[in-house]
């Protein structure tokens, strides 16, 4: 059934908003916006189950994982808080080289979790050697490392694969990664890099409206969460895991944003992740040259 004319005019004139020359929110394609203009469905019924199950393979592919990918109606900061409140029962080492690395540290402090900042000059990456020195010099002190993969405030891409390998040298330490401006735009490998928690938001490299956060968690992360009573209610990692096989959300979702996610995941998979990463790299190089 065709959309009413006034609605169709609204969702097919994105050029009125101009081009967004900023990390996000990004320009959203008209067909993705149009996908949102559909009736709301009951989020505890078969319609929601079909919607989420239909995206399952694509979302796992996006994160390069066999683990389920959780979708939350929140900003990505919500899943940053999830990492802090669900994955540490001791002290946290936050890798800070920009505004969003600092945000991880601030969240830890606000949530009453002891945390230290391993800071580098803004515009420089954290090196594996620096992290190894920090962990080796403080044995048994830290149980969680947080890092931003693509630090939006500086443009630095941290070597997360190598940093995760350093963390894996320590049996009781987990690693949580902010991939907000990298997932969907640059290579991120949840399984191959042996990460414990990876999060992103809808409004950056996924080119969706703001309002959704996505994350994946390792078995190690879930085992850690089971030992922490005060995990948060809204951002309880175990509840996300419990709902995942049912293809249900933990709380009332923004259904129409899920429609947009479904439409955009179809576009991303049609393009192919490798091709999408290459396209982003080519655009970056053209911008740097200009």
Regions picked out by a protein language model, each given a short descriptive name:
Residues 126-184:
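Active-site phosphate-binding strand-loop segment of PLP-dependent enzymes
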Residues 17-73:
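A glycine-/small-polar-enriched, mobile loop at the entrance of the PLP active site in fold-type I
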């Amino acid at each position: 059934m065709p959309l009413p004319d006034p609605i169709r005019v609204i969702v097919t004139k994105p050029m009125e908003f101009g081009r967004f020359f900023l990390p996000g929110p990004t320009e959203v394609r008209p067909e993705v916006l149009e996908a949102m203009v559909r009736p709301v469905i009951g989020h505890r019924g078969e319609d929601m189950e079909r919607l989420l199950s239909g995206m399952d393979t694509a979302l796992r592919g996006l994160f390069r994982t066999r683990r389920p990918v959780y979708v939350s109606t929140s900003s990505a900061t919500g899943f940053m808080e999830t990492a802090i409140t669900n994955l540490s029962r001791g002290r946290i080492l936050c890798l800070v080289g920009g505004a969003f690395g600092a945000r991880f540290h601030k969240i830890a402090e606000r949530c009453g979790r002891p945390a230290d900042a391993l800071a580098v000059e803004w515009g420089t990456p954290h090196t594996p050697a620096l992290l190894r020195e920090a962990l080796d010099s403080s044995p048994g002190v830290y149980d969680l490392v947080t890092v931003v993969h693509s630090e939006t405030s500086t443009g630095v891409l941290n070597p997360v694969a190598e940093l995760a390998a350093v963390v894996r040298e320590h049996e009781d330490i987990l690693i949580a990664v902010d991939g907000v401006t990298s997932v969907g735009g640059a290579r991120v490998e949840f399984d191959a890099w042996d990460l414990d928690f990876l999060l992103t938001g809808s409004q950056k490299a996924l080119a969706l409206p703001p309002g959704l956060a996505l994350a994946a968690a390792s078995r190690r992360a879930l085992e850690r969460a089971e030992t922490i009573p005060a995990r948060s209610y809204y951002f309880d990692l175990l509840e996300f895991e419990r709902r995942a096989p049912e293809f249900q959300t933990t709380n009332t979702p923004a259904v129409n944003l899920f429609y947009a996610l479904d439409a955009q995941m179809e576009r991303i998979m049609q393009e192919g992740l490798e091709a999408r990463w290459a396209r982003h790299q080519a655009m970056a190089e053209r911008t740097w040259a200009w």
